[in-house]
Amino acid sequence: MATISKLINEKGVKTALSFAAPDDAEGIQYVIEKLGYAGVDYSYLGVNLYADRNGINDYVKTLRATVKEKAADKQLIVSNIKFPRKNEDETASTETQADSIYNLLSASISDSNAGGLIYDEAEYVGSWNGFFNEQGLAQTSLAVFGFAQGWNIDIDSYRDPYEYGDDTGLKEKNVTINKISNMSESTIRGVDVGSYVALTNAGVKYYDYDGKEQPLMKILKDNGVNYIRLRIWNDPYNEKGETYGGGDSTVDNGLKIGKEATKYGMKVLVDFHYSDFWADPAKQILPKAWQKDANDPDKMCENIHDFTKDTLQKFKDAGVDVGMVQVGNEITKGMAGIHNKDSNNSVMK
């Protein structure tokens, strides 16, 4: 990890790290110490959170205070979160979704931490957690990113209830969302759109508040998003050439999305999972092509180095504005085939 972070920084790109949120917010100190011992050079320290965590905003404030004390030059961000806009007991709405995002974003920001968050599954249409309803129409909760900057976004466009059958939440209640103090250009207002190509290939379309079909990236930019995250899987196909699903997050698809994001003035976060599919606290499975080298640390370092370097070169050649690179995903207990928090020092080095 130290070697890869050095390579990334030499390319003029900032390094991000993402960890599953520790049970105790002050437990992030252990992570910071391990990274320091290993000599990992990073700019962003991200924590992945679940929306149902009790006291989530106070938890993030405690994280923020701990990072300020132990690693004052690092920017703490929420690297993965999603909130429901509807649920079975009908207590969720676009209003509660927007409030939750706004409050968490606010909790991450202080006079010493630019903060920010990356919203997961933002591109999913009809998802209970996404920003687009079953017809692909942008929901008013998406506008929270712009409102938090003090933007005046028109969300009061006409909607035909017989066409959309949609509870617009914020629009109907005329909720005012104030600008967040201490927000800066460095504050991350990001969304994960790693499945965008797979969804558009399946025929999914996106519409703005006027009901006009628009590219997803334009809708996001117009609502205050400044970063998009792309997860990168090495080879997400089985022996028959069939995708494992999950959005078909290949390098080639990432390049397509990255070029469109750059076109609309957003930066790109490239998230290397160093796996053929999802990597998370429960699994860090080596890519098929690297499994033969599992017991050869030098060869494994070479594999990770070359894949990282070659992929970033492709993004550079394509003109994609890569603002940060995330090394691994939820690497609290390991990465790249190593899955034990007590023995992952070799990964960090």
Each model region followed by its residue ranges:
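N-terminal substrate-binding region of glycoside hydrolase catalytic domains
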Residues: M1, E163-K256, E260-K267, S275-N303, ...
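Active-site cleft segment of glycoside hydrolase catalytic domains centered on the general acid/base Glu
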Residues: M1-V40, L49-A65, E69, N87-Y102, ...
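Acidic (Asp/Glu)-rich catalytic clusters
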Residues: K6-E10, I32-D41, R64-A71, I109, ...
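Short secondary-structure boundary segments
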Residues: K14-G27, N57-K68, A198-N226, F272-H273
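Hydrophobic faces of well-ordered beta-strands that scaffold small-molecule active sites
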Residues: T15-L17, S43-V47, L76-S79, G115-Y119, ...
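Active-site beta-loop-alpha junctions enriched in small/polar residues
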Residues: S18-D23, V47-D52, I81-P84, D120-A122, ...
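First exposed extracellular module after export/assembly in secreted or surface-exposed proteins
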Residues: K68-A72, S110-N113, Y119, Y158-Y162, ...
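Aromatic-rich peripheral "rim/lid" segments of glycoside hydrolase catalytic domains that contact
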Residues: K86-N103, A107, D111-K179
